[in-house]
A protein has these predicted regions:
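Aromatic-residue hotspot detector
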Residues: 30, 38, 104-105, 119
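Long amphipathic alpha-helical segments used for membrane anchoring, targeting, substrate engagement
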Residues: 1-7
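Surface-exposed, charged secondary-structure patches
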Residues: 76-112
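Core segments of small alpha/beta cavity-forming domains
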Residues: 7-79, 83
């Protein structure tokens, strides 16, 4: 998923880019769930729990994460999310799907004695609008820093 929205672009007329978020979109519950999903996915990634990761990702993203987990082998991983903030950047909809871009910033610490490290990344999540029970699924991660 290489398509990423322009976060701070401006037009030739000099007007600032305004993200497209539908007026009826429930931003606060979405952000609350996005933060929870970030933390749960981090824990599932640390433990290599592909079943739990599958619940939060598209099949393509699951394949990428699975390959990363296999690459690290038996090396244990413990990441503490020390602080997280999230901002909804954009929501694009078609007749049958929606894609939302969420910018996560905060601090992570590897292990129990690692130094806190800042992170800044954009997650692209998608939802099947034809299925009333569909969840938002992680489709891509864009590192910004």
């Amino acid at each position: 998923f290489n398509t990423s929205p322009e976060v701070a672009a401006s037009s030739s007329a000099g007007t600032a880019y305004r993200p497209s978020i539908p007026a009826d979109f429930q931003v606060e519950p979405f952000i609350r769930n996005a933060k929870s999903s970030f933390i749960r996915l981090q824990a599932a990634n640390d433990s290599g729990d592909l079943d739990q990761i599958r619940d939060f990702t598209t099949p393509e993203m699951l394949d990428e994460i699975s390959a990363e987990i296999k690459q690290r082998g038996n090396a244990s991983q413990k990441t503490e999310v020390m602080f997280i903030d999230a901002h909804l950047l954009e929501v694009e909809t078609t007749s049958d799907s929606a894609i939302a871009s969420v910018r996560f910033t905060g601090q992570l610490r590897d292990g129990t004695d690692g130094e806190p490290e800042s992170f800044d990344e954009i997650w692209h999540v998608q939802k099947d609008l034809k299925d009333p029970n569909a969840s938002w699924l992680l489709a891509g991660i864009q590192q910004t820093a």
